Each structure stands twice: as C-alpha cells, then as structure tokens.
C-alpha cells in the first residue's frame, strides 16, 4: 500500500478484475505488523491512498483484507473501523503462523472469536437497515453460486487468479508463501 500512486491505481483499474488491499483495521492494530521500510507503522500513509484507490475504482471489485491475531481477538472493531473509513467490501482472516509465535491464535481465544462473528452479523444487519451496509466476504453464502463454489471446483486460484505482491515488489502465488524462496516468482 505504501507504493500506491496514480499510475498503480490506473493500471489496476484497467487491468485487474479484483484487487485486495491490506489493512488490519484500527491504527494501533495495523501498525503492529505493517511497517514501512524505515520501521514505522504504515497506517497513516496507506489509508488515504486506499480511500483514493477505492473512489477511483468505481464499481469494480476490490476487498479490504485484514488479519486478526491473538493481539486483536476483538477484530469486529477492526472491521467496523474499516467500514467507518468508507470501505464496503471487507474481509478479515485469522493469522497463519507457527503455534509458538506470540501472535498465534490459541484455544483460549476461540470463545471470544466465535462471539465476534455473532457481533459482526448483528452489526451488519443494523448498519444495513441504516443504509450503511457493507459486505463481509466470508458471509457471502450462496450454496449454488457463491464465491467459494468455483474454488471447490478449480482450487483456490493461487498463482493463477491471485498473487501476493510484497512491499519490495516480489511476487508469490499466495500471501502464505511470502518469504519462502522456492515460491518466489
């Protein structure tokens, strides 16, 4: 996100069917892991760029995707923060890490996480009734034609429909492979 400029926006809007932007939610949550090249949190630099990107994108697909960890098991607050910033296509997924990583989710986190999904559903209904609705990717359930039916048939799309771009420009078939040299494209 820190490298987004008008050229990147124009290219993505012309060439990319769907774009995924990484924002973990609230400033303190995002800045914990999302640093710039100098080691500073990137929230203040990227949020205005993402807002401009989405504004120029019009009705083309995008998702604002965050990651929740042991440090933000109250992740609905991060989703609501993103919605309050004006983003309407949202996704929030659990961290993928070694169990020994301090950010790893634990068995003790599960009751809190389950409760968060209930809170999310209720708030989505409330906001929709108020005319402030948003989409949460993982609640898009359509058993005959939802977004996951195609993934069940053809796989997740890693490296064909989806690629991860690191801040330094390296390409990987999936964000889960970033840093593993055998998957560097």
Q: In which residue ranges do the predicted regions lie?
A:
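Radical SAM enzyme [4Fe-4S]-AdoMet core and its adjacent flexible, acidic
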Residues: 28-47, 51, 55-168, 178-184
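Conserved SAM/AdoMet-binding glycine-rich loop
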Residues: 1-27
């Amino acid at each position: 996100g820190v490298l987004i400029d008008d050229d990147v926006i124009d290219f993505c809007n012309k060439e990319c069917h769907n774009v995924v932007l990484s924002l973990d939610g609230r400033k303190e949550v995002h800045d914990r892991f999302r640093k710039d090249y100098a080691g500073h949190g990137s929230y203040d630099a990227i949020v205005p760029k993402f807002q401009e990107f989405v504004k120029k994108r019009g009705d083309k697909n995008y998702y604002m995707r965050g990651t929740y960890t042991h440090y933000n098991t109250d992740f609905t607050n991060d989703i609501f923060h993103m919605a309050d910033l004006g983003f309407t296509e949202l996704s929030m997924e659990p961290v993928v890490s070694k169990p020994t990583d301090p950010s790893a989710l634990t068995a003790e986190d599960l009751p809190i996480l389950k409760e968060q999904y209930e809170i999310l559903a209720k708030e989505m209904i409330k906001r929709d009734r108020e005319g402030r609705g948003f989409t949460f990717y993982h609640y898009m359930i359509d058993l005959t034609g939802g977004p996951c039916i195609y993934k069940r048939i053809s796989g997740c799309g890693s490296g064909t429909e989806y690629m991860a771009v690191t801040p330094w420009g390296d390409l990987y078939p999936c964000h889960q492979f970033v840093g593993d040299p055998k998957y560097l494209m």
